[in-house]
Amino acid sequence: MLHFLETDIAGRKLKVECGKTGMLSNCAMFISYGDTVVMVNVNASEKPREGIDFFPLSIEYEERQYSVGKIPGGFVKREGRPSEKSILHARAIDRPLRPLFPKGYRNDVQVVCTVMSVEQDNLPEILAMNGASMALCLSDIPFTTPVATVSVGCIDGKFVLNPTLEEREKSSLDLTVCATNERVMMLEAGADEIPEDLMIAAIDFGFNACQDIVAFQEKAMKEFGKEKVTPELYHPKEEIEKDVTEFAFESIKEIMYITDRDERNLRLREIKEKISNEFAEKYPDDGADIDEVVYTLQKKVVRNMLLKEHRRPDGRRFDEIRPISCDVDLLPRTHGSGLFTRGLTQVMTVTTLGPIGDAQVIDGLGVEESKRYMHHYNFPPYSTGEVKPLRGPNRREIGHGALAEKALVPLIPSEEEFPYTIRLVSEVLSSNGSTSQASVCGSTLALMDAGVPIKRPAAGIAMGLITSEDLSKEAVITDIQGLEDFFGDMDFKVAGTEKGITAIQVDTKIHGLSKYCIKTAINDARKARLFILEKMVACINEPRKELSTYAPRAYTINIDTDKIRTLIGTGGKTINKIIEETGVKIDIREDGTVFVLSSDADSANRALKMIDDLTKDVKVGEVYLGKVTKITNFGAFVEVLPGKEGLVHISKLDINKVNKVEDVVSVGDEILVKVTDIDNQGRVNLSRKDVLKQQESNNSKEK
């Protein structure tokens, strides 16, 4: 049966059509906003998956090139693996939905969001986030809390709801807010050093705007939502829970109060082995239940410690940051490096500078763009002392890399100010919480060490949260470590400078965050950020004045746009010849700006002269040292600039009368000639005679 519903959001129609397609899916629907259309399909397995201790939710964000009228490039001519942007959007959809499923739900759930049509003014990822929530609400899957998502911009201090492409380009804020009718579920922001009070107001603006979409989803649920199935939820057997708690709770409590991480982990392994041996005969096939009970006991102890005793596992105050150390210039042959250590979390970031032509070209569903600043994040297994196969970057690594990249985007100098492509790579050497924010700090150190003139240093911090079961009590903590992240309710990451916020990412494991919690986290994060910046500036207080000896130098020359073809030459012949002869790298912009990159100044200067000679015009009245290229009975052809020849008529070869051209010059001779005129057909007429007369005149004056 076909169902249709629409509402008005920010002056544009939000429409939902359900029941027309995907008849075999649990729920299939089309959701549109303007001319942007996303198809959402959700399905769940009939029974829980056996042998797992997590909720197997799978979110897929599929981009289709036909949505923007493109045919995929490459030999295959079809979409391949998900792009980094697709992965980031899928993660953003997952984060607000996952906490709202019933605890203990182990059925496989898959949400597939397929982008079918894109109008650049209306972001498909925002639409997909709303569609995913709505499709789950309309299905019989046990998901009953609608989540709405909006985009918020800020232009001249005024907030804009779901900004258009033109508005996004003007905006100093790119904020995504996901919320239920009561609380904020997820935040993602990139900003141009926005003050804390303005960011808090923007989040509040987004939360209020979400309420219309929540009401829209609730209306759809009432009108044509399916009746929800009663799920089979996982819970350890009561007798196992009782026996393990009686046997081990006091021991686990004692262990969790040990502040030294290594000793605590050793004692935990010992007690787990004791528990396993104690119940091996009584519960031989219930190892998963026993592990779940032990985990629950650990969690209970840590949460009570924080919420009721106001004590942290490592003994710190709630607003206290772990010991920090910073170092730079660690790797001799790299262009810049920085090492940031906070407690047992340690990240080394390395900077590489390259030509503008090395910028990454992004040809997705949006407007084609190039990215000259990149940040990549690697999280190897040794960072947590584990042994795992080394493979390509996973979704988490891509997400953390993008967050740290976003934090520094507003601080990177313009192409005109610093004509380089910049790549940062953060290597996580040790992980005990908040490695993405340590990457922000490491990136700042590495950029300044490389001599990149960033506007200001940036730092990042992760805030945590512990709440009571009814959410009536909450405690916000600064600089969360592994245990607090693992057993806590929130990971609230804030990056920025002394001036303001540049990036935010918020995940929660509970049914949302209160306004008080958000305000407290943002304000406390500022205090922490300023403290960290002091430590970083003590290590290196400004970008180095000189680039590394091993970094290439960039030189710029401007040419007329109509000379670009001349510089490139047929099939790139001319520019490739310059590159081969000098060993430089050359990039040409459409406006006539030419970038020359070389580690050797002499090579760069030779290339610049060759480019200048190729592209500058021959001027009447100028004297040139030219080379004779051809001799005829009426004169000699002389190349005055590369590829530019003129004729010296026989009558203009010498002061005295010339009978034969060969009596005066030969092919290959270099002679001084003056440009007398350029005719309507562009032919250049030269005179050696005028130069000789001028020389005679000068000699007479000197005498």
From Swiss-Prot:
Source taxon at top rank: Bacteria
Classification via Gene3D superfamilies: GHMP Kinase, N-terminal domain, K Homology domain, type 1, Nucleic acid-binding proteins
Pfam family for this entry, one: PNPase
Entry binding sites for Mg(2+): 485, 491
Function description: Involved in mRNA degradation. Catalyzes the phosphorolysis of single-stranded polyribonucleotides processively in the 3'- to 5'-direction.
Keyword Transferase assigned: yes
Enzyme Commission numbers on file: 2.7.7.8
Species of the source: Clostridium acetobutylicum (strain ATCC 824 / DSM 792 / JCM 1419 / IAM 19013 / LMG 5710 / NBRC 13948 / NRRL B-527 / VKM B-1787 / 2291 / W)
A GO cellular-component term linked to this record: cytosol
Protein's name according to its UniProt entry: Polyribonucleotide nucleotidyltransferase
